[in-house]
Each structure stands twice: as C-alpha cells, then as structure tokens.
Amino acid sequence: MEGYWAVLFPVLKVWFSCVIVLIMLPAMFGISLGITETYMKLLIKTLEWATHRIQRASRAEEILKESASNGLIQRDNSSLEQEIEELRRNRPKSADRGDFTLSDVLYFSRKGFESIVEDDVTQRFTSEELVSWNLLTRTNNNFQYISLRLTVLWVVGVVVRYCILLPLRITLTTIGLTWLVIGTTTVGFLPNCRVKNWLSELVHLMCYRICARGLSATIHFHNKQNRPKKGGICVANHTSPIDVVILANDGCYAMVGQVHGGLMGVLQRAMERSCPHIWFERSEMRDRHLVTQRLKDHVNAKTKLPILIFPEGTCINNTSVMMFKKGSFEIGGTIYPVAIKYDPQFGDAFWNSSKYSIMSYLLRMMTSWAIVCNVWYLPPMTHEEGEDAVQFANRVKSTIAQQGGLVDLAWDGGLKRAKVKDSFKEQQQKKYSHMVVGEDSSD
C-alpha cells in the first residue's frame, strides 16, 4: 500500500504542476501558449476526415438536409390572411355577406398536421441535430456503422475525452469555481470602495477564464469597440449557463437571473457578496417590482458595471431567438445587444434544464470535444420616438437574430414549461372572424 502512495503522490504533483503552469496561470492573465489552438487544429482535421468517410459511405442517400433547423416541412412566412386568400383565389366571388368557404378548412387542417409532425416551438427546446456525425455517442441518432476505421477512431476519441480531457477539465473547473466562491466571499467582507470593486472584477475575470479553459472553450469576439459600457444594459440570446462564462471572459457584468438551488445557488450567493448581482424568484410578483426598481437604480449609477440580462428567460437551442420579455426594455438607458452563436460540431452547448441537472449538463460539456463560439458586440441601441417597450424589444431581438444567423421567432420561451395562452388563440380566432364577417364584427 505504501508503494502505491509513493507512486501516486509524485504523479499527482506533476499533474497539478503542469495544470497550474501550462494552463491555469496563462488563463488568469488572458495569455495563450498555443495548446488549445494546436488541439483545435488537430480536432478539425480529424472531424473533416470522419465527415468525408461518412459522406463517401452514404452517397446513395442524403443523411440530412442543410441543417435540422431547416426542418422537415417547408413553411411560408405568409400571414393567416395571405394564405387563406391564396386558397380562395380561384373561387367565384360570393354574393352573400359571409365570406366562409369550405377551402378555409384546408388551411387550418394543414397547419394542424404541420404542428403535429414538426412545430416551430418545441424543437427549439431540444438539442440541434447535426449534418454530419461528430464522433460523440450522444449525437449518433441518425448515423449508423460506417467502417472499421471510423469505429476505431470513435473508440480512440472516447479514451481521449474520458481518460485525458475529463480529468483535466474537472481539475480546472473545480479550481475555477472554488476560487470564485472563496474569492468573492472574501472580497465581500471589504467595505464598499474602489478597491473592493477592482478586486471583485479581477476575481470574476480570472476565475471565469480558468473555467473557460476547463471547457476547452475557443471564443471569437467581434466588434470589440461596441462592448457594453458602465451604466448600460447588455442583452443576449440565451443557450446555457456557460453564456455567462463566455461573455465574462472579455469583461465583467452585474448579472440578473432566476434564483437557483444546488451548485448554482452556492455560486449565486457567493457572487452577490462582492458584486451587485440581482437574483429573483420569477413566480413572486413582489420580486418583479423590486427587481425593476433595483435595475433602474443600477442604470442611473453610471459608475456601476453593465447589467447582463437574457430577456428570453430560458435556454433555447441556439438555432433561434424567441420572444424578449419587455421588462428589460422599460428601464431606460442604453441597450448593448450581443449575439452568441455556438458551433454544434464540437459540442452541444444547449442546456435542456427539464431533462438534465446542472451537474449532468456540466459532465456532458466536459466530455465534449470543445466549446467553440462566436460573440458579436452590436452597436448600442436606444428607444426611438413613439416606440413602446415591446416594439423596442422586437427590434433588438431581430438585430441579434440577423447577426447570429438565428431564426427570429415571436413565440414565448415560457412555452417550454407552460401551455399556449388563451389570449393567443383568441387573437387568431379574431383574425379569421374579421375575414368572415368583416371588421365590424363584435369581439
């Protein structure tokens, strides 16, 4: 037994020394030694070779269309009125006041079948399917055995991801999160002053950079001249909790979000000690009013960190942007839109919170190949004259969707856990009733 420990301790000593010197210290100061870049180049060539083998073996049939996000069904962007008018085009004009025809039934039947087969909403709450297999078991739903070489490569990949990368990533993430809790808690005991704010920003920045290395994250920031400034509000599309890690690698933010339990709750309580983050319970109406007032006070203090808000209110699978809650746009101040787009070929960053706990999700992230994403800082936006909060939110959302190459959807992300509101159904019914009996119909 003594011989076992005599061998283990030197191995662990060398392991931690390499992690600290080659990865952790450079990460803390934002320096790269080229290790991640070399790994990514090798990974890209490996996946390109695997893709070529898969495509060669499946020339007889197309594995998938351009992307699963394009869907099984080709939909038009036409409105209810436009599509029904198209169906009625060849029908003789009726002399009756009523404008109902049997062909109208075809429109509603088609929409119903389309929603049953593949709707626009629920597919945004599941992981995006890939055009070509990326050698991860969890994404092998549509790709079967191809060749012995590809199988051997997959086995080698499993060994690399679980026996080499996973221990390394767990080590780095544990160090990063531990330092974050200890550092923010310690800084929290200091009186409010410039030194406390500076130390808080330093602790957050260093710890998030270590955590990013723990995910083998490769982040490409674009248009840095548009980075959020103090006293502003940064809004971004939301894919997972690591969105915070990604953005905080390039600057510090005061965060606004839902109260969580477990590991997330521990981190939230520790971070709140050193920085004016705002956590709330979404179901409590009283919390909403308090949050709104705190946000207004924060924005009015131009010396405080920019606020980071995810207006969708839930995680979407990075193929689209769903409805932005208007509360973030009623506060006033300058909005700094940010578009985040992950590359699913290297790893699925989407957190399906209804299916995976935060620990299960982190394990999936740490056993992926890497996290690769692009972040675009967009020009600051403000309210236009005569524009209400909803219109402003939709304008910001459209800008983010266009830059990130995402689908712009008007649906509420809350449909992940709730049913469609009756008011939306009534809105569609009113539209059709106006077509049938005219605009003067009673509601």
From Swiss-Prot:
The chain crosses the membrane at residues 15-35, 146-166, 170-190, 358-378. The keyword Endoplasmic reticulum applies. It is found in: Endoplasmic reticulum membrane. It holds the Pfam family Acyltransferase. It is an enzyme of class 2 (transferase). This is Glycerol-3-phosphate acyltransferase 3-like. One of its GO terms (biological process) is CDP-diacylglycerol biosynthetic process. It is a multi-pass membrane protein. It comes from Danio rerio (Zebrafish).
